[in-house]
Amino acid sequence: LIFVSLPRISNESSMTQDNSIVIREYLTTDKEVVMNLIKLNTPNFFAKEEVNDLSNYLDKEIELYYVLLVDGKVVGCGGINFAEKRTIGKISWDIMHPDYQGKSLGKKLLRYRIEVLKAIPSIKKITVRTSQLAYKFYEKQGFTLNEIKRNYWADGFDMYSMQYNEL
């Protein structure tokens, strides 16, 4: 076990001040809404084959996973996994409700997880594997493209392997 002091989340966002934004750890009771989020983003951002992959991840592979709530409603989620004796932090399974995309909430959730990883002394590298549909988002947040594997996730869904530059 590793204990990390988690960064505080402010309520600042590009949304109106009436909106309360909270990031908290995923609970198993969140699974249904998280699964609905991926379905809402399929096939625009995820291949249909990935829906079952996410379910398996939530049941068996989850390490750190968070949900983002606006006014008490889960509208986004994303995780962290570890590799190479916890020296690599891997950003995983970022999903945002389509109605809440483009409002800086995905950026807020990503930044939160980057801060969590920066607070872990053993972390030397932060990576993400995404697709051609979302890699520009990570590029804007300080990630650099390292490799592309065509049709990796599914037919027409390439894998873009990226690394965070500001660690």
Residue spans of the language-model regions?
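Conserved acetyl-CoA-binding loop-helix of GNAT-fold acetyltransferases
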Residues: 96, 102-115
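Conserved GNAT acetyl-CoA-binding A-motif
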Residues: 117-130
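A short beta-loop-alpha structural element at the N-terminal edge
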Residues: 20-34
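A conserved beta-turn-beta hairpin within the catalytic core of GNAT-like acetyltransferases
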Residues: 82-92, 101, 120-122, 156-158
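Helix-loop element at the rim of GNAT/NAT acetyltransferase active sites that forms part
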Residues: 25, 35-49
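Conserved catalytic-core motifs of GNAT/GCN5-like acyltransferases
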Residues: 127-129, 139, 144-161
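Conserved beta-strand in the GNAT
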Residues: 67, 73-81, 88-95
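Active-site rim helix/loop that mediates acceptor-substrate recognition in acyltransferases
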Residues: 44-66, 70, 79
